[in-house]
A protein has these predicted regions:
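Helix-turn-helix repeat elements of alpha-solenoid scaffolds
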Residues: 34-50, 83-93, 127-133, 166-174
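Terminal, low-structured helical/coil segments at or just beyond the last alpha-helical repeat
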Residues: 24, 200, 206-244
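N-terminal leader/linker segments that initiate helical-solenoid repeat arrays
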Residues: 16-70
């Protein structure tokens, strides 16, 4: 009888611990999603997730969300070394999440986003060796979830970044971004990336249309991204192509 009581207690404590962890992760992501209201929310989000990972190293969600947070921390620092430090941390937590569950689209996505940022920070020519891995990761994500708009965007921008001789193709970029916008028309980054693609083609009329759409989004999928990143970038690009 005592054996069964012990087993029941273990199960109960496990459930309570899992519920507590879920609540902490929810709180961390609430802070992450409202970082446009308070800049300190991002580091607070990191600290909470770090605590969960330290107490539960195999918590899938905590690891891939921490990977996501480090990606944003990397975007927010100034120097190349600081950026690489943040992105590499994000990569490692994404890698851990993949090991926990190789069929997690989120684990693969935040891993590959950090890998991509490492490549962008080092420069395309210094990061060509990363391209096969990025392609493999994106294809894995889209196999798990064919409508993963983030993965479609990464794949699209890979075609945008690569030189033509190495497979770059801005028309393919536009095709993939169009597909992503059909799936989620409130994902503001897609419009900025689409505009950048048209600017590359010197099609400024279409570029302006997509840049103006950014300000028209009423219910953004990622409000903090719209306010902190996408809208300012759209306005900056509109100024750059003014009169063209």
């Amino acid at each position: 009888m005592f054996k069964y009581v012990s087993i029941c207690l273990v199960i109960i404590f496990s459930i309570l611990n899992a519920q507590n962890s879920d609540s902490l992760i929810d709180k961390a992501m609430e802070l992450f999603d409202t970082r446009h209201l308070n800049a300190e929310n991002l580091t607070e989000s990191r600290d909470i997730l770090q605590g969960v990972v330290e107490s539960e190293p195999d918590n899938l969600r905590a690891n891939y969300e921490l990977s996501r947070v480090y990606y944003k921390l990397g975007d927010g620092v100034e120097t190349k070394d600081e950026k690489l430090e943040m992105y590499n941390k994000g990569k490692e937590y994404g890698k851990k999440a993949k090991k926990i569950d190789d069929n997690s689209a989120s684990a693969h996505f935040w891993y590959v986003v950090n890998v991509g940022r490492i490549g962008q920070t080092k420069g395309v020519l210094n990061s060509l060796f990363l391209v096969p891995e990025i392609k493999d990761e994106v294809n894995k994500i889209l196999k798990i979830d064919p409508k993963h708009t983030g993965a479609l965007d990464v794949k699209a921008m890979l075609y945008y970044e690569l030189p033509g001789l190495l497979g770059g193709n801005v028309n393919k970029t536009i095709e993939l971004l169009s597909k992503a916008i059909e799936i989620d028309s409130n994902y503001s980054l897609l419009y900025v990336d689409m505009a950048s693609s048209y600017i590359k083609k010197k099609d400024y009329e279409n570029a302006r249309w997509f840049l103006n759409k950014v300000s028209e989004i009423e219910n953004p999928t990622y409000e903090a991204d719209l306010i902190l990143n996408d809208k300012p970038e759209a306005l900056e690009l509109l100024e750059e192509i003014k009169g063209k």
